Amino acid sequence: MAKNYYDITLALAGICQSARLVQQLAHQGHCDADALHVSLNSIIDMNPSSTLAVFGGSEANLRVGLETLLGVLNASSRQGLNAELTRYTLSLMVLKRKLSSAKGALDTLGNRINGLQRQLEHFDLQSETLMSAMAAIYVDVISPLGPRIQVTGSPAVLQSPQVQAKVRATLLAGIRAAVLWHQVGGGRLQLMFSRNRLTTQAKQILAHLTPEL
């Protein structure tokens, strides 16, 4: 069966978007607010009608992720910020694999996310209450699977409990995208053997987005 590289690229961009947001948060203490909203909202939608629907139904919602994906696919340097993004992206894929093989872990994750949906009736998605709840899911369900993702950035920034919660919530969104990536036919070998195909697809999607003014 032929791979749907459009869906695979969108899901991969979802992982990369989380990686980029984690990097921004760790270094600056803040990140692209619109992209963060899209990524966090993807956690909540358990029954999307399509891959694009997971990310709000608009390719533009994944602009940050698509641009990051191109950087990761074509990274000539294994040092600095690009190396961080590659490490976060690959680490999320490893954790997703461990999540799938850990008995009962996916069910636990689903039940905890259902709890988030109930909280959303009373609190905003980016409220401290929801951020803390999403961070707690990451700590309780994902972190024990190991190995833990080492987030690097400004030590002063990373000491903030609010930033820590946002980083963990964003990593949870990355796991969500990695689950989706696997569901639509994604696999790590594609990063080696289908790099050109993924690059072309990401460029095509970006090409028909309206430019940011």
Swiss-Prot record:
Negative regulator of phage lambda lysogenization. Contributes to the degradation of the phage regulatory protein CII. Acts probably by holding CII on the membrane surface, away from the target promoters, but close to the FtsH protease. This is High frequency lysogenization protein HflD. Gene3D superfamilies: HflD-like. The keyword Cytoplasm applies. Residues 99-126 form a coiled coil. It comes from Escherichia coli O157:H7. It is found in: Cytoplasm; Cell inner membrane. InterPro entries: HflD, HflD-like_sf. Interacts with CII protein from phage lambda.
